[in-house]
């Protein structure tokens, strides 16, 4: 494996360096070919590197940044005042070729705007989309996008997301001829927004896309599709609802509970069932799939959950490594070149509509 250099915005997220720096050391332990540029306040970073050994320090470099973009800042204001911020400096390292990818747990809107400004979208892509890979009950994986980068999406954008998601499923998840579906409120052709139905009509005409139609949200984890496409508002709400339910379910499995005294054999059976079920469903733990790729840019950017713990942020770093190794932006660009001649112009000009 060739050497990789990633830029980490270590000041972003709810916990900042207290989580991101230990996660960086964890990632270095897992990958001997990895070099990390830690972007942020050196006074906050340096004490957290006290436990790093000589070999780890040789693959670390602190890149000073003057400020941090607040998680509650309006994206437009954050972008205007972004010079010298840890997020912008990390993205500039990618733009300058000093790093091959950027990982940040910071403000999503600001990251989207700055990434688009500095790294530029691929030819033929209007706006990038946030994408992640979720496990499903068949022990496989489903690519889901958009997860919040674009609140309102027209039909053209949904088609572009489908193409990008299909490439990611093939190249990173290694699913041959991945099935692609649009998230909708029903499976019937007449259901949903005009933008969804218009996107569906176009996807049916693209030979390189294995389009299977609509899928409802309750089937997200069933494994019925390999790529699920939706607008960012719907995707973000769907993802967070699913994560909340999964966390509650796993928490209930692990809890001992309170109540009346039970015989020793019932308590033993209960604990065995808890451990067995926890192992069975542990692959659904959101920490294991943290890290959404900002797909559609000329460079690689990974958005971590703001509330990510050390383990989860280390997973986001690994997501960046995989995206760089698989050359995802280059492969998407190549696929777009082959698809565009098939016809991308939508009859309605890509306008959004109303629910039917």
Curated annotation (Swiss-Prot):
Q: Which reaction does it catalyse?
A: a fatty acyl-[ACP] + phosphate = an acyl phosphate + holo-[ACP]
As for subcellular location, the record says: Cytoplasm
Q: In which pathway does it act?
A: Lipid metabolism; phospholipid metabolism
Single GO term (MF): phosphate:acyl-[acyl carrier protein] acyltransferase activity
Give UniProt keywords alphabetically: Cytoplasm, Lipid biosynthesis, Lipid metabolism, Phospholipid biosynthesis, Phospholipid metabolism, Transferase
**SUPFAM superfamilies, per database record:** Isocitrate/Isopropylmalate dehydrogenase-like
Give yes or no: UniProt keyword Lipid metabolism: yes
**Major location, coarse class?**
cytoplasm
Disulfide linkage: none
- Entries under Gene3D superfamilies matching the protein: Isopropylmalate Dehydrogenase
Classification via Pfam families: FA_synthesis (PF02504)
Q: What is its EC number?
A: 2.3.1.274
SUBUNIT field: Homodimer. Probably interacts with PlsY.
Family per record: Belongs to the PlsX family.
Stated role? Catalyzes the reversible formation of acyl-phosphate (acyl-PO(4)) from acyl-[acyl-carrier-protein] (acyl-ACP). This enzyme utilizes acyl-ACP as fatty acyl donor, but not acyl-CoA.
The protein in question is named Phosphate acyltransferase
